[in-house]
Amino acid sequence: MSNEGKPLQLTESKKIDAKSGEKEKALSLVVGQIERNFGKGSIMRLGDASKMRVETISTGALTLDLALGGGYPKGRVIEVYGPESSGKTTLTLHAIAEIQRNGGVAAFVDAEHALDPVYAASLGVDVENLLVSQPDTGEMALEIVDQLIRSAAVDLVVVDSVAALTPRSEIEGEMGDHSVGAQARLMSQAMRKITGNIGKSGCTVIFLNQLRLKIGITYGNPETTTGGNALKFYASVRLDIRRIQTLKRGTEEYGIRAKVKVAKNKVAPPFRIAEFDILFGKGISTLGCLLDLADETNVVTRKGAWYSYEGDNIGQGRDNTITWLEQNPESKEIIEKLVKEKLTEGSEVSANSMRPLASAARQASSRPNLSQVSANG
């Protein structure tokens, strides 16, 4: 009985092999035809792609880098939105400074005509080599963005802001004229046009956006962003930034505490939250971010108001501890290295808690060592 079934099985397997061979041949023919018509690289197997992992740009805040899965993704569209004076422009200026430090070229399309070069320079931006455009119309701004992207010579383009991209028809019209949906149509057309070029050139484009309130909304969130829905769909990352606290020394205000929620992320888990300090005239407090994560991962321990490192008290209160980190750069480097090591240990966490990587690292540090367990056993 079993011997009679073997020839039938062999015949079936030969048929399957022949069929798969024909399909593979047809596939290679059609791929070759597409490449001849549209150029090399117009279609490929994903495993053959030269860059599988998405490269990132640091945001300037270690906590936000972790929430984003490394930083801003290169070659993608990013939207940063929030209320006034929440830190939107500061975030993008730090990204520009990071790009320039690594030898890249950045451009700032200042549709609001509000860029402060002195403040930008204080954040580390090389204002001498920063490309700046102050366009008259929304069409002009987006055409400039498209040409910069297609040049493949620019690594980062910042548009400040979508709300200020006024269509030509509105500028040439009179006050009070209704131009319903003109800005949304402009943004939709621009997104369709520039998205393909962004992927090819590897240029990152950050759009800053403002908030508006929907009229007549009783339930749910009445807030929305300007420029229609196109940017929401085309953006790989959307960041919602809010001011949650004003930092004071006595009666003097010296900064704000910002909270960023990753509202959308196509390259890492979304809905993570990061907090950091923005100091007036100085930008994001990198040492403040480091201290927060060192506390989360138990590299630096806190008892009451005192912070201690390796059993020694290093500062009473957060401000004094940050000052100690400034005055001891060697210890700061060691603490930063230890924090990153612990975060790497706990990087497989899947929960979207406030600081998931840090909380996982804390669990990893409290877990007993297997060698110690076996020795004690």
From Swiss-Prot:
Question: Can you tell me which residues the record assigns to a coiled coil?
Answer: none
GO cellular-component terms in the record? Answer: cytosol
Q: Where does the chain bind ATP?
A: G82, P83, E84, S85, S86, G87, K88, T89
Q: What is its main location?
A: cytoplasm
The cellular location(s) given in this protein's UniProt record come to: Cytoplasm
- Bias (Polar residues): 362-377
GO molecular function terms here?
Answer: ATP binding; ATP hydrolysis activity; ATP-dependent DNA damage sensor activity; damaged DNA binding; single-stranded DNA binding
* NCBIfam families for this protein: tigrfam_recA
Q: What does this protein do?
A: Can catalyze the hydrolysis of ATP in the presence of single-stranded DNA, the ATP-dependent uptake of single-stranded DNA by duplex DNA, and the ATP-dependent hybridization of homologous single-stranded DNAs. It interacts with LexA causing its activation and leading to its autocatalytic cleavage.
HAMAP family documented for this protein: RecA
The record ties this protein, via PANTHER family, to:
MITOCHONDRIAL DNA REPAIR PROTEIN RECA HOMOLOG-RELATED, RECA
Can you say what this protein is called? Protein RecA
Q: What is the lineage of its organism?
A: Bacteria, Bacillati, Cyanobacteriota, Cyanophyceae, Synechococcales
Underlying gene: recA
